[in-house]
Amino acid sequence: MTVRVAINGFGRIGRNVVRALYESGRRAEITVVAINELADAAGMAHLLKYDTSHGRFAWEVRQERDQLCVGDDAIRVLHERSLQSLPWRELGVDVVLDCTGVYGSREHGEAHIAAGAKKVLFSHPGSNDLDATVVYGVNQDQLRAEHRIVSNASCTTNCIIPVIKLLDDAYGIESGTVTTIHSAMHDQQVIDAYHPDLRRTRAASQSIIPVDTKLAAGITRFFPQFNDRFEAIAVRVPTINVTAIDLSVTVKKPVKANEVNLLLQKAAQGAFHGIVDYTELPLVSVDFNHDPHSAIVDGTQTRVSGAHLIKTLVWCDNEWGFANRMLDTTLAMATVAFR
């Protein structure tokens, strides 16, 4: 069957989900029937067609009254502020992809369900009372038909969780630290301006800016045994896309750097193919733009100190990789629910 999807919020992730759907050739499996976005339809069409990070969209895009047309497909455009007013029942929506970055509670998910959607997938970490949080490639097989309100976690969680799992399964992780080196985001300023976080009052293009992160909590959500044994910090850097994560873990078993690389390379070619990639090329962040993997391990940067301290550098396109995982998780939810 074809999964009927509605998108709530047509920002960076919402637009990339649509682009990824068309570029990946999965339109026979997923069809977008509606997009709810407060911005005007002309702006939506323009930003879908022209993207500073990902270039010009190959499909024809045009606006026709209350529709956004992509090729021969017509997608209904809505401008509803209230979740309760959304016509999901009328449109026969199977899964809502909530890409607002604002909603993430069970209450918000239930509002989509009350409006007629069968399932909801949030594009960001949700509250602890959601039915499931999925990192595709790691735990999507735990989805059940009764799981109606699900989170796809975050781009950084999707990037680092597969690598942590591989290292823990092989060597037994005792503790770890993570530093996220993240491209600038929409909640930063173009020039100095007011913000509740005083560091984010500063111009995004001129500084490396430390910000708060809940990545450690995201890690322990998947690995409860690491509670109080993982810490994370994050900085934003003056680039517009692609993120690097510096992961350091102490492990129980002694290991060498080449053994770590071999483990991760084999995983990229085997069980985690399509989710994790591995490279030893002398690449920089822009080279990972538009990469669909959740994580790309940079084998040139792997280090081991004292046989028990492993340091790795993992890249991801925090937009494109995550948008592709949104599609993967949508299909996984539909498979268990509607088969």
From Swiss-Prot:
Complex and partners: Homotetramer.
Xref: PROSITE patterns: GAPDH
Keyword NAD recorded: yes
Documented EC number(s): 1.2.1.72
Binding site for substrate: S154, C155, T156, R200, T213, K214, R236
GO process annotations (BP): pyridoxal phosphate biosynthetic process; pyridoxine biosynthetic process
Entry keyword set: Cytoplasm, NAD, Oxidoreductase, Pyridoxine biosynthesis
Active site per the UniProt annotation: C155 (nucleophile)
Annotated positions binding NAD(+): R12, I13, R81, N318
Protein purpose: Catalyzes the NAD-dependent conversion of D-erythrose 4-phosphate to 4-phosphoerythronate.
Primary subcellular site in the record, as a coarse category: cytoplasm
A Pfam family per the record: Gp_dh_C
Name the record gives this protein: D-erythrose-4-phosphate dehydrogenase
Enzyme type, top EC level: oxidoreductase
Cellular component terms per the entry's GO annotation: cytoplasm
Pathway terms, separated by semicolons: Cofactor biosynthesis; pyridoxine 5'-phosphate biosynthesis; pyridoxine 5'-phosphate from D-erythrose 4-phosphate: step 1/5
UniProt subcellular location: Cytoplasm
Record InterPro entries: E4P_DH_bac, GlycerAld/Erythrose_P_DH, GlycerAld_3-P_DH_AS, GlycerAld_3-P_DH_cat, GlycerAld_3-P_DH_NAD(P)-bd, NAD(P)-bd_dom_sf
GO molecular function: erythrose-4-phosphate dehydrogenase activity; NAD binding
Protein family (similarity comment): Belongs to the glyceraldehyde-3-phosphate dehydrogenase family. Epd subfamily.
Residues carrying the site annotation Activates thiol group during catalysis: H182
